């Protein structure tokens, strides 16, 4: 069975690297620059905010349709232009640390009726499941659409360990009390009959509701590759789902309100299933929702789904902090939210500008064209076609001058694209420019 080690991150991310060789070519007309922390951005942010009535006049086209020829390669712009807001705030943020208190506060909102608790994976039922799986062995794919279960390295040790744990298992819970330290690997029993398995570490936490300690989420794209569970062939589909995507989004938004989280928006919705990673049993079908930062109403985007591309300019390590994108995942079926996870939270410290002055969109278009021209002229790419699939005003992270611990969330124009030079035609990449000063934004940091 395909599965990740459970540190709150479910799913499989594939990174496709385009190898482009540098060639001696004429210098592009316009230099492509990143925010170098020289204070220029701060000066713009200190300017008087644009009055709200003027913000209404900021106009963008409904779509961008254009073909840009660059030698024998081309960039096809064929995308709607997303500008979901009419005012453009800038925020200052810092990373928020995970502690046991973080988990306790979230659990208090989700399960105020928590009564009992036990260490996850230690009940007789759970240990028997794991022992049966260890005796069965691992699944080995024969590459011909079949396969078999067989022994694996360390199998005998696992069987012996589980037999000893089973012999000493005590199926008793203790009165619930707030957790004192991380990591947390417990199952909480509630007065209303719910069972919530809690996993929490120093960079994430996850709650699984009424699905057991071994439940993992598998999205439709992962399942379709085959082998996600046992001998499932390529093209495997997730079965019927008794909830609509719209209902799933409503449930996710309600969960955000329950947890008291602001600034998160739904970035994607995908059919998914929850499976028992030990017994290889499908537990329920529903939808996986990815939620990302959308402070100020900016369009959310999931940088973890964007591949690494040589067309994307990365800031040197000396110029940046390796910020990790705050991200949440939820699984929703007809019973509601059954799984919720948070990774790498950030804290908004203040609003730097309530309505920053943006560059005209025509200027943004020229900057993005120049980005593509710059890369194609300095690389030996022949006959490539890049297709721009999405253009959106997002909130992106850029550093604060002379401060490694804080960053700004600024409006940035994100340009997602695919390329016919890679092995995965549906893999998306992205470039972005700061909508305030036109400098490059490294989207893999945002």
Locations of regions flagged by a protein language model:
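A short, surface-exposed interaction/processing loop segment used at functional sites
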Residues: 205-242, 323-358, 428-446
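N-terminal secretory signal peptides that target proteins for export/translocation
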Residues: 1-6
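Preferential activation on post-signal-peptide N-terminal prodomains/segments
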Residues: 24-320
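Sec-dependent N-terminal signal peptides of Gram-positive bacterial secreted proteins and lipoproteins
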Residues: 7-28
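Activation/maturation switch segments at domain boundaries
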Residues: 29-41, 395-446
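Segments that shape or occlude catalytic/ligand-binding pockets
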Residues: 248-424
């Amino acid at each position: 069975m395909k599965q990740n080690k459970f540190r709150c991150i479910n799913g499989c991310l594939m990174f496709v690297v385009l190898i482009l060789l540098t060639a001696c070519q004429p210098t592009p007309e316009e230099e492509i620059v990143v925010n170098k922390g020289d204070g220029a951005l701060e000066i713009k942010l200190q300017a008087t905010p644009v009055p709200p009535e003027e913000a209404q006049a900021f106009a963008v086209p409904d779509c961008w349709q254009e073909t840009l020829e660059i030698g024998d390669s081309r960039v096809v712009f064929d995308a709607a232009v997303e500008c979901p807001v009419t005012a453009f705030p800038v925020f200052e943020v810092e990373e928020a640390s995970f502690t046991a208190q973080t988990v306790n506060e979230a659990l208090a909102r989700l399960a105020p009726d928590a009564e009992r608790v036990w260490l996850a994976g230690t009940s007789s039922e759970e240990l028997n499941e794991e022992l049966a799986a260890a005796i069965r062995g691992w699944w080995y794919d024969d590459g011909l659409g079949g396969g078999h279960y067989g022994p694996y390295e360390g199998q005998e040790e696992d069987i012996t360990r589980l037999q000893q744990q089973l012999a000493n298992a005590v199926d008793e819970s203790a009165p619930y009390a707030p957790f004192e330290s991380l990591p947390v690997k417990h199952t909480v029993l509630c007065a209303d009959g719910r069972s919530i398995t809690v996993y929490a570490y120093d960079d994430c936490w996850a709650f699984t509701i009424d699905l057991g300690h071994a439940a993992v989420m598998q999205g439709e794209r992962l399942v379709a590759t085959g082998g996600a569970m046992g001998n499932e062939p390529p093209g495997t589909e997730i079965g019927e789902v008794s909830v609509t995507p719209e209902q799933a989004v409503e449930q996710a938004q309600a969960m955000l309100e329950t947890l008291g989280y602001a600034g998160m928006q739904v970035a994607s919705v995908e059919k998914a299933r929850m499976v028992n990673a030990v017994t290889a049993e499908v537990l329920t079908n529903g939808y996986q929702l990815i939620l990302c930062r959308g402070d100020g109403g900016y369009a959310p985007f999931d940088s973890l789904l964007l591949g690494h591309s040589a067309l994307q300019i990365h800031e040197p390590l000396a110029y940046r902090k390796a910020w990790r994108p705050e991200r949440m995942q939820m699984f929703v079926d007809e019973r509601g939210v059954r799984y919720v996870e948070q990774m790498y939270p950030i804290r908004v410290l203040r609003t730097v500008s309530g309505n920053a002055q943006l560059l005209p969109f025509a200027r943004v278009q020229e900057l993005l064209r120049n980005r593509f021209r710059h890369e194609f002229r300095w690389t030996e790419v022949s006959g490539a076609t890049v297709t721009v699939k999405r253009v959106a005003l997002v909130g992106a992270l850029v550093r604060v001058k002379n401060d490694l611990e804080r960053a700004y969330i600024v409006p940035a124009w994100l340009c997602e694209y695919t390329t016919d030079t890679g092995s995965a035609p549906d893999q998306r990449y992205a470039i972005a420019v700061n909508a305030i000063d036109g400098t490059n934004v490294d989207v893999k940091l945002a």
